[in-house]
Amino acid sequence: MQKTKCYLAALVSAVLLVTGILAGCGQSKKDDHLTVYLWENRLMKNIAPYIHEQFPDQDIEFIIGNNDTDLYSYFKEHGELPDIMTVRRFSGTDAQDLQPYLMDFASYDVVSKYYSYAVEYYKDTDGEIQWLPICAIPQTIIANKTLFAQYGIKVPENYEEYVQVCQQFYDKGIKPYSMDLAEDWSNQEIIQAAAIGEFTSLDGIDWRNKAETSAGEIKFDDVLWKRIFSETSQFLKDSHFSKEDINVNSNTGTQMFVEGKSAMFHGQPTDMQKLQDQMDAELIRIPYFSQTSDSSFVYMFPSLNIAFNKELEKNQEKLDTALDVLDCMISEQGQKLIADGSGVISLNTDVPSMMQNVPGLEEEIKDNSIYIRYSAQKSFDASLEAVHGLLSGKMDEMQAYNAFRSAMNSKDSKEKSTVNFENEYSISLNDKSGRDAASSILTTIREENDAQLALTPYYYYTSSIYKGECTSSRVGLMTAKNSDTPLYLVKINGEQVYELVKKYLTEADENFYVTTKYELPIASGMKIIVKNKENGFSLKDITINDKKIDTEKEYSILLTDTTKSILKKINPKCAIEQIGDTTLSSAWIAAMSNGQQPSAPEDYIEVEK
């Protein structure tokens, strides 16, 4: 990553001069502290360590977020907007309230590194660019090429041939396309992919630009949208989808494809690789075809969208650090990590697309025939309602369009508060390197499940607990809903508890381990005392009620996926019980649903030099 390395020397010296204004949620009082919110914990395990590696002398804290701009609206309401924010599902419409608080990228050099089509939908009516996409993930049809060859069926190269292919497989008793239409994102995909020629037309681009910047009701071009729903309906018929497909979830659709009961599925490059590992067949990707021309397009979405707090512009050195973090993300290696491997469409002119192992899309990539999905939050539910209406026969094309339009412009009902928090706890590190908000949440969940101890990674807790009334949806934003984890209970002795914590600090995950104070685990019911080493931390002691843990005594301990997997390595035969369908997020929401106060934070960690 040559560009990032070039900046490193300048950054190290610049950080010593930083003076400015604290801008992040729960940030430390040091002026050079930069807070970066990443929308899922996969990013905490790959891109965060990589950035730390590039900038070892920078004080950069990564905190888990959610795939919802409302999290940042919540922070903004309490005057604690982070320095850097990310989401995947994004539309300018969803972030209107944040607009006055976000930095405009338009005047910065970073925009010149993007292809024009990549920022086309990110400009507001004033020409400002407050969000930028970070690399693209193709979401296209995955075809079983071996099955095509077995039946002498040609892989389609245009929409007419696609229709013929579907009919040929249907006539042979094989489902042409098993799509998981029980999922909202697939219904959203099917509308935009079926009418991709309309969405990429001048009329479609014009509507999209207006919709992305609409501060109120989204205006619909009836002529355009009648065509869109006509083509959506036609695609459903041509693909031989029926009302039974309404209940096909991701697992069912995948299994049909793996077993050769369907000829086509859909997904990302990582999905294709997983399918390839399960199948003795050659797979190939097929783009989505326009119904109005011979054009074809790669339907894709950014791995993440990123925004900067406007306050960064008041501190040039800190802004330079933030821009270098962004530059690190859009480097070739950064994009590979963010996109989780191969199959990355670079949106940047100086980084090549990494599609060598993803056959079938060569011409579209070469011609930049790429469509970035429209992903306003309401469009997911609106798409599901409309497509299910068409499939069930309860709606014709016009009724489906009207339902979609109504859902997109529906008014959000005012949500009632479910709890009035009497105390405020910060998600930032306290003077002992603990997080009071995370401690409060975990202790509440532990006590609700009658466990004596609990140990979880730090990357399940997103927000401070703010004093005052709070709705259920905002309570839910305090934990990482988009990176949720089941909860487990197990009884082990004190020696095994000690070994569990020790292993967590050194080898929590083959791709992730604790290197900075920001990555230390969250514990409850016990206090872990750790020593700060040059390349991480080591466990010195564990106390319970100010006494050393009894190595022979049995304790019930609450675990998550990560801590459970570590325990399994230590003691493969231990009986670990999953707590039904309960997740960390659902347990927290349920605990607060009756208006009770959360448990007070515990003094659960101490770091010795």
Outline where the language-model segments fall.
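Hinge/lid segment of periplasmic solute-binding proteins
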Residues: 88-140, 154, 163, 190, ...
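A structural signal for short loop-to-beta-strand junctions that line the ligand-binding cleft
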Residues: 74-76, 82-83, 111-146, 175-181, ...
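C-terminal capping/gating helix-and-loop segments adjacent to ligand/active sites or protein-protein/ligand interfaces
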Residues: 43, 61, 300, 339-412
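Glycine-centered hinge/linker elements that transmit conformational signals in sensory
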Residues: 211-245
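Catalytic centers of hydrolytic enzymes
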Residues: 414-609
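Extracytoplasmic/periplasmic solute-binding protein
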Residues: 130, 163-216
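Extracytoplasmic "Venus flytrap"/periplasmic binding protein-like
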Residues: 53-117, 146-151, 157, 256, ...
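Extracytoplasmic/periplasmic substrate-recognition and gating elements
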Residues: 277-340
